Amino acid sequence: MVGGGPAGAYLGFLLAKEGLKPIIFDHSHPREKPCGGGISILAIEKFKLLHESPEEKDLDYNIEFISPSGTSVITTGKKSGWILSRLILDKFLLDKAIEQGCTLIQEQVIDVQFKENLWNIRTKMQTYQAKFLVGADGVNSIVRKKILGPIPKQDLGICYGCFATSNKKEVTRIKYFEDIKGYAWCFPRHDHLSIGIGMAEGDTKKIKKIFNDFITSYYPDINIKSKWGAKIPIIKNPHFYDLPCADDNWMLIGDAAGHVDPITGEGISYALWSAELAAKAILKKDPKSFNEMWKKEYGDTLRTSCTSRDFFYNPKLLEYSIKLASKSKTFSTFLYEYTMNQIPSKDLIKRIIKDISKITKEYIFSSLRS
């Protein structure tokens, strides 16, 4: 496997647990990453291994949403998400994989070639050979570039942010904007803040300006420790999901496969989920079955998010949704649960229809009181 982040490490753990001897190539993990660090309720409930992490998990039952015009509402969920630094999460998963019997080669892979039924994996130090290759090497995947070509530029989003400290106790905050399809965030971690902005398209100059304005407006007194920038898969063409992610001798998982929610940008759940399905396909000696497995399990959710992204980020809809959440406890909880990946995109309309009567009554009652 090329890549020792959540997808690669979890796959290594699962395969080693079943007696295989997987090898992970990664020269940099575990490390802090440009990532908010939010662990969704979906991930917490689905992947029990996460509960074994000895590190303190910052529980988060509340999220403040801010509309493009500045209207805000604090939503509360019935279940809590977690906030962890990626250094802690990635180290935990990689350590578990190694403990289970996975081998870590701390060398940077610079090229892969398939010759005479073997993969030649070239690092900066030497060349290795393998019969089967997994690309878990993120958005800029070398494995993907060699097999399918890179993720198209139009399907890449950009993120920019910082790690900072504050004397104030901050809440989890998400801020939407008038003219970008994305949002700014603040995730309070155990001993620092992760603050950033992600958008589906745009240039570095624009995202830095919006980020700096966000800091000036909401966090003027923080102490910035470091800044970062990164790309993220934000798929805009639903036909992207028609591409194969596996064949007889290779597989792509996590960000390398483009498996990130196109609306929320959440990728950890799908990194772990894709690893779980990949392990099943490999263990039954049918790696190509991974193509149908991931589409059946979460493909509809990613595709629905992709096709409804423009609708979701309509400024008028965002304004109305946050106003509605301020007047309806049911809709407020719905907004929280969707953000925490409790409600998949494909079930959004069904869930709203189910609760529409209750939401309407709460809205009318609240409006009359005010």
Model regions and ranges:
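Generic enzyme active-site microenvironment
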Residues: 24, 135, 253
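Glycine-rich FAD pyrophosphate-binding loop
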Residues: 2-4, 11-35
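A short, flexible beta-alpha/helix-coil linker loop
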Residues: 30, 71-72, 193, 257-260
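A conserved beta-strand/loop capping segment in the N-terminal third of enzymes
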Residues: 39-92
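C-terminal helical "tail/cap" subdomain of flavin- and related membrane-associated enzymes
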Residues: 280-370
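Predominantly flavin-linked oxidoreductase catalytic cores and closely associated redox partners
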Residues: 4, 14, 18, 96-226, ...
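FAD/FMN-dependent oxidoreductases across multiple families
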Residues: 111, 203-281, 288-289
